[in-house]
């Protein structure tokens, strides 16, 4: 387990679009040193950008690595996924040990969007992983800062 905990790790997720309220996005990043960076920009009703940074315990980082590893996202390829478009884009970059992978696709509203793609199984894995990571990040941020992230 000590070797697993010392494994190189980095994860960055971004989802956003440029619309009538400007550049609206959600982005978070887990770093190997335990830092979690979070940014949420919504210009709706003149909201301002929310930026938060916290340091996580090794146990939380280990859980994040487990979530990524068990999702098997590192075996996927985004070549047959929908290209980012005017509706928006999602990016996911992961470094886990000696593996480094980066994905870019359009925004996914629901599982129906996954089923209509050329790679429904791969996109479904991506969709569920992103949902799990967002849930984890929102919980960590709201517990730490006592704010509502969205």
UniProtKB/Swiss-Prot annotation:
One CC-aspect GO term: P-body
Places the protein is found: Nucleus, Nucleolus; Nucleus speckle; Nucleus; Cytoplasm, P-body
Keywords from the UniProt entry: Acetylation, Cytoplasm, mRNA processing, mRNA splicing, mRNA transport, Nonsense-mediated mRNA decay, Nucleus, RNA-binding, Translation regulation, Transport
UniProt entry tagged with the keyword Acetylation: yes
Coiled-coil region list: none
Signal peptide span: none
A GO MF term: RNA binding
Phenotype on disruption: Male sterility due to pollen abortion after meiosis.
Expression sites by tissue: Expressed in root and shoot meristems, cotyledons, vascular tissues of leaves, receptacle of flowers and siliques, and pollen grains.
BP-aspect Gene Ontology terms: embryo development ending in seed dormancy; mRNA processing; mRNA transport; nuclear-transcribed mRNA catabolic process, nonsense-mediated decay; pollen tube guidance; positive regulation of gene expression; regulation of translation; RNA splicing
One Pfam family cited in the UniProt record for this chain: Mago_nashi
UniProt modified residues of type N-acetylalanine: 2
Main location: nucleus
Functional summary from the UniProt entry: Core component of the splicing-dependent multiprotein exon junction complex (EJC) deposited at splice junctions on mRNAs. The EJC is a dynamic structure consisting of core proteins and several peripheral nuclear and cytoplasmic associated factors that join the complex only transiently either during EJC assembly or during subsequent mRNA metabolism.
Known partners and oligomeric status: Heterodimer with Y14. Part of the mRNA splicing-dependent exon junction complex (EJC); the core complex contains MLN51/CASC3, EIF4A3, MAGO and Y14. Interacts with PYM. The interaction with PYM is direct and dissociates the EJC from spliced mRNAs. Interacts with EIF4A3.
Recorded family membership: Belongs to the mago nashi family.
Protein name (database record): Protein mago nashi homolog
Protein source organism: Arabidopsis thaliana
Higher taxonomy: Eukaryota, Viridiplantae, Streptophyta, Embryophyta, Tracheophyta
